[in-house]
């Protein structure tokens, strides 16, 4: 199941530093994390759906690239985002 418009707006308002800053790394990572969670649940039920598994790997890869960019640019924002999203460490 994909993310609803209301859920996406809630994520944007929660993680954006400005009112409608949808392009910030924090917002993009939050939306990707939500999509990854939904797709993980789908892949657990439909374990032979290899196209969705590939899509899941692509989403994880793009989130990893965004997080590594943020880690290089601003370590404090990176650690705050990791803690808020509940990712590693």
From Swiss-Prot:
The keyword RNA-binding applies. InterPro entries: Ribosomal_uS15, Ribosomal_uS15_bac-type, uS15_NS1_RNA-bd_sf. One of the primary rRNA binding proteins, it binds directly to 16S rRNA where it helps nucleate assembly of the platform of the 30S subunit by binding and bridging several RNA helices of the 16S rRNA. Forms an intersubunit bridge (bridge B4) with the 23S rRNA of the 50S subunit in the ribosome. HAMAP family: Ribosomal_uS15_B. This is Small ribosomal subunit protein uS15. Keywords: Ribonucleoprotein, Ribosomal protein, RNA-binding, rRNA-binding. One of its GO terms (cellular component) is cytosolic small ribosomal subunit.
